[in-house]
């Protein structure tokens, strides 16, 4: 029977992967290439297409795993460039994680001995949610973070039920994967650790493992948390040391000119605490419907007052609270996708809730299904008609990037072209000879920006000043160049937001 269930899990995961990847390819060929996702592909592209070839070209700001997994596609793109320029590689990675999340959820129902009918229905309601489908196909990291979160919560609830240390090891490995995808893994780990400590303090089974006297309970909690979180702590320390050894700044990923903190100058104010709360709720409420149904199911089955409810609140809403604080402090843009995690994390607690309900498990499953269905309907409507929920559809690669690449390919071949890849990443990916260009990861980039004439630069590509264009290295070094020019540079083309200059010799 167990073998048959595993086959079903793999079959469902394979189907999800193939559907998501096919949908991602469709999106790419129809121009839906989201900027953040394509930037991850670009980071991998630089490794094999910018001299000298090395992994540091991937950059130190964004977590490396999504880019690292695309390196085989980047290598193959030397013969067929659409593998990277049409989103085939990035959709492969997001589809892979979407399948992982679905498999983890489906297997969790089996671990909790839930009815197969309920397991399949609830897993499909999660997998077919429009938000899950879109982010499983578009190469963004939200589905990757969500899948790792489902794996973590699955093992958390299985550990709470059985106490087996095997699940702690699995949680630790999943946290490593999560950290290599997004930095939100750190606050999420804190919320999970608090939930684990609460469980060990209250659970009668856990109390059997330590004497209830002196500091023994604290030592037991500490040792359990070390077992769980040491892998991700080690990974985070390695990442800090990696930044330090290369840049001299251990927190380069947090405070450099390309980091998220550099964006904060462009984030709007939301009018204090109440304004921030209103802003967040207007975006997060459809994501909360599965969790609201989960709480209702626990109330209907008389399990709401158990301590596990507090653990669920910490795990599902912790990142939402963290993001709200960041928005209030002006450190987050508050996009809908930054608030989507309850949609991924709440379903992971459904198997435990159905199991804990005992004879009322059918009722808990039905209520949970209604919450998942309601969320799917609202988000499906939002993608069609709501400007709020359609905002993520509009954040594509910079317009005219391909036209700039076409111009450079046709008119500037053989010349030394200088550009900051911050806004020109998609132009670089469409270049015929990107190895000849000087971009942000090139060893001589800073010298060329400081003195293009002395360093033999032939052409410059400069984005329009204003908003994110102000973060471009050339605009920072030469603030008059875009609008007024410089005596050593002649404008030869203007394409969309970009201007191309020839350096006078």
Predicted regions and their residues:
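Signature aromatic-anchored transmembrane alpha helix within multi-pass, membrane-resident enzymes
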Residues: 14, 117, 229, 233, ...
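Short helix- or helix-capping micro-motifs
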Residues: 16-17, 119-127, 154, 175-179
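Short acidic/glycine- and proline-prone juxtamembrane loop motifs at membrane-interface regions
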Residues: 59-62, 131-144
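Transmembrane-helix motifs of polytopic, lipid-linked glycan transferases
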Residues: 89-113, 151-155
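Hydrophobic/aromatic-rich transmembrane helices and adjacent perimembrane loops
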Residues: 136, 142, 187, 331-362
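Membrane-lumen/periplasm interface segments of specific transmembrane helices
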Residues: 191, 198, 202-206, 219-294
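Hydrophobic, aromatic-rich transmembrane alpha-helices
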Residues: 282-309, 350
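Membrane-embedded, lumen/periplasm-facing catalytic core of multi-pass transferases
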Residues: 367-425, 442, 446
């Amino acid at each position: 029977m167990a073998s048959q269930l595993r086959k079903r899990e793999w079959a469902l995961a394979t189907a999800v992967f193939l559907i998501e990847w096919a949908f991602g390819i469709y999106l790419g060929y129809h121009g839906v290439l989201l900027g953040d996702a394509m930037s991850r592909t670009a980071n991998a592209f630089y490794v094999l297409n910018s001299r000298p070839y090395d992994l540091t070209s991937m950059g130190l700001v964004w977590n490396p795993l999504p880019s690292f997994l695309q390196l085989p596609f980047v290598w193959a793109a030397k013969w067929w460039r659409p593998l990277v320029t049409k989103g085939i590689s990035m959709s492969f990675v997001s589809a892979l994680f979407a399948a992982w999340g679905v498999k983890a959820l489906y297997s969790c129902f089996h671990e909790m001995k839930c009815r197969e009918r309920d397991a399949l229905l609830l897993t499909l309601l999660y997998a077919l949610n429009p938000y899950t489908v879109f982010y499983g196909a578009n190469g963004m990291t939200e589905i990757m973070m969500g899948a790792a979160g489902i794996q973590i919560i699955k093992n958390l609830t299985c550990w709470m039920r059985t106490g087996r240390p095997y699940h702690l090891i699995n949680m630790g490995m999943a946290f490593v994967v999560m950290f290599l995808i997004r930095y939100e893994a750190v606050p999420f780990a804190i919320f999970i650790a608090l939930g684990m400590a609460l469980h060990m303090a209250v659970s009668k089974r856990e109390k059997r493992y330590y004497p209830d006297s002196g500091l023994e309970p604290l030592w037991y909690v500490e040792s359990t948390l070390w077992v769980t979180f040491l892998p991700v702590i080690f990974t985070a320390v390695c990442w800090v040391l990696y930044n330090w050894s290369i840049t001299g700044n251990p927190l380069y990923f947090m405070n450099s000119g390309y980091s998220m903190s550099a964006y904060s100058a462009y984030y709007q104010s939301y009018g204090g605490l109440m304004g921030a709360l209103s802003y967040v709720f207007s975006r997060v409420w459809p994501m909360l419907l599965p969790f609201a149904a989960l709480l209702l199911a626990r109330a209907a089955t008389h399990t709401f007052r158990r301590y596990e409810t507090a653990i669920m609140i910490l795990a599902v809403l912790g990142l939402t609270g963290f993001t709200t604080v960041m928005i209030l402090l002006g450190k987050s843009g508050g996009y809908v996708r930054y608030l989507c995690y309850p949609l991924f994390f709440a379903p992971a607690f459904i198997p435990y809730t159905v199991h804990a309900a005992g004879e009322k498990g059918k009722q808990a499953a039905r209520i949970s299904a209604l919450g998942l269905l309601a969320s799917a309907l609202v988000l499906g409507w939002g993608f069609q008609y709501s400007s709020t929920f359609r905002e993520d559809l509009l954040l594509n690669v910079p317009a005219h990037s391909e036209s700039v690449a076409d111009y450079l390919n046709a008119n500037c071949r053989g010349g030394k072209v200088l550009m900051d890849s911050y806004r020109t990443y998609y132009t670089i990916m469409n270049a015929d000879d990107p190895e000849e260009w000087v971009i942000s990861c090139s060893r001589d980039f800073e010298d060329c920006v400081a003195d293009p004439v002395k360093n033999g630069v032939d052409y410059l590509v400069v984005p329009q000043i204003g908003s994110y264009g102000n973060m471009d290295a050339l605009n920072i070094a030469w603030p008059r160049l875009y609008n007024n020019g410089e005596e050593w540079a002649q404008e030869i083309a203007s394409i969309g937001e970009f201007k191309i200059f020839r350096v006078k010799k």
